[in-house]
Amino acid sequence: MLPRFLTASYPMERHYFMVPKFALSLIGFYPEQKRTVLVKLWSFFNFFILTYGCYAEAYYGIHYIPINIATALDALCPVASSILSLVKMVAIWWYQDELRSLIERVRFLTEQQKSKRKLGYKKRFYTLATQLTFLLLCCGFCTSTSYSVRHLIDNILRRTHGKDWIYETPFKMMFPDLLLRLPLYPITYILVHWHGYITVVCFVGADGFFLGFCLYFTVLLLCLQDDVCDLLEVENIEKSPSEAEEARIVREMEKLVDRHNEVAELTERLSGVMVEITLAHFVTSSLIIGTSVVDILLFSGLGIIVYVVYTCAVGVEIFLYCLGGSHIMEACSNLARSTFSSHWYGHSVRVQKMTLLMVARAQRVLTIKIPFFSPSLETLTSILRFTGSLIALAKSVI
């Protein structure tokens, strides 16, 4: 039984970017959040913790490469996600005004769709966006928590066997000795643990924005498809509409063309905002998944569980990007097919031209444009194939 906020019975307006809003508000980076002095200080503190954590993890991993490759990979695997989350944090801050504008405009456009069928589209895709981003949040939370649990269980087992407690942090990081000794060690441990959660909420927020916008654009395209088909519907194809009726259809058709143009413009704006995040994610995804699978092969006991959960979290991340892109492309194709299958040929030449123009525009599928990649399920299969090649190469070397 799912919690109510993950079901279609939950109010739709509260589904709108619910999980990204919750995640980014925790660290003071949600675009619609009031930027008070306390929020600014809190967001800077979280930025500093994440930045220093990335440096300390990378330093530790590079230092241990010639000493112990398994220990080095134990640090370098999570640092890739941490650096990626830092990129996402900076991008969200840099584009906060544009993101706020997009959030407000898409909210306004979706609120205009009020028919029973359109409300069904909204309920379906709003709920899907919340469910998938919450799944990502759960995977990320479990991954970050598993690192701390692993360290605590390892040390508890050491104590039961009469050995000393190892003063290390949940994530392998290089710190001055003073910070790894009592009385400062508990504070260092808590801050490193919080660093893991900052990493999680950053990628949940950014990935949730991407998936949410893609699914909300899909809703707008489906609603546009219904309006076009309803407008062009003709009861008797042999009977020509009156001049007044044709004039009304032309006016309504112009509004629909403008709506289609605006969705295309919003997609372009989203591409500009998400280009750095999406490119970095697609470039590093194979490396991150491959490294985590290699860690599964190298570790035993609790280490395997940690990296199985980690692999699931990274896999869900890249799946959300590809799923969102596929939904937009499919909605565009359906719009073109449905418009061409309507009764456009029963109207005046001007209406026919406008209809065929919309068909031509819809056939140029809307995508989130990033260099070298196009988010889609086909791209996901290519990434997984390349990941398999990296794993095979790593196994042969190690």
Swiss-Prot record:
Membrane topology label: Multi-pass membrane protein
InterPro entries reported for this sequence: 7tm6_olfct_rcpt
Tissue: Not expressed in either the antenna or maxillary palp.
Membrane-spanning ranges: 15-31, 47-67, 75-95, 125-145, 200-220, 270-290, 296-316
Record localization: Cell membrane
GO BP annotations, alphabetical order: detection of chemical stimulus involved in sensory perception of smell; sensory perception of smell; signal transduction
UniProt keywords, alphabetically: Cell membrane, Membrane, Olfaction, Receptor, Sensory transduction, Transducer, Transmembrane, Transmembrane helix
Extracellular membrane side: 32-46, 96-124, 221-269, 317-398
Domain of life: Eukaryota
Note: The atypical heteromeric and topological design of the odorant receptors appears to be an insect-specific solution for odor recognition, making the OR/Orco complex an attractive target for the development of highly selective insect repellents to disrupt olfactory-mediated host-seeking behaviors of insect disease vectors. Odor-evoked OR currents are independent of known G-protein-coupled second messenger pathways.
Annotated function: Odorant receptor which mediates acceptance or avoidance behavior, depending on its substrates. The odorant receptor repertoire encodes a large collection of odor stimuli that vary widely in identity, intensity, and duration. May form a complex with Orco to form odorant-sensing units, providing sensitive and prolonged odorant signaling and calcium permeability. Involved in the behavioral responses to pentanol, hexanol, octanol, nonanol, propyl acetate, butyl acetate, isoamyl acetate, methyl caproate, anisole, heptanal, 2-heptanone, r-carvone, and nonanoic acid. Also responds to pyrazines.
Protein name as it appears in the record: Odorant receptor 24a
Native source organism of the sequence: Drosophila melanogaster
Gene giving rise to this polypeptide: Or24a
